Amino acid sequence: MLKGKVVGTIVSTNKLEQLVGFKFLEVRIIENDVLTDKYIVAVDKAVSAGIGEEVLVTTGSSARMATGCPTSPVDAVIVGVVDKA
């Protein structure tokens, strides 16, 4: 699992049927509480993350399972928003 910060949205008007209803977000990876120069695109189907929020991202086969459609062509899914204490 990765920690990151949502830095942007990606709009896709044409996409595979399995991806309809998914929100695409650009996430900047955080390592050791420091923003890195690494970015990924992750889908958000359930947590409604927004720009500026820190999120938890799962990748690989776990990401496909998290979408509810194990055959979806998804590599990264936002599974949680990090609460600030």
Give the residues covered by each predicted segment:
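Structural detector for short beta-strands of small beta-barrel domains
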Residues: M1-N14, V81-V82
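Short aromatic-glycine-enriched beta-strand elements
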Residues: Q18-E26
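Short, acidic/hydrophobic/Gly-rich beta-strand patch recurrent on exposed beta strands
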Residues: L25-I29, V41-V43, L56-T58
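C-terminal structural segments of small proteins and small subunits
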Residues: S48, V55-A85
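Short, structured beta-strand/loop micro-motifs enriched in basic residues and often containing a Trp
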Residues: D33-I40
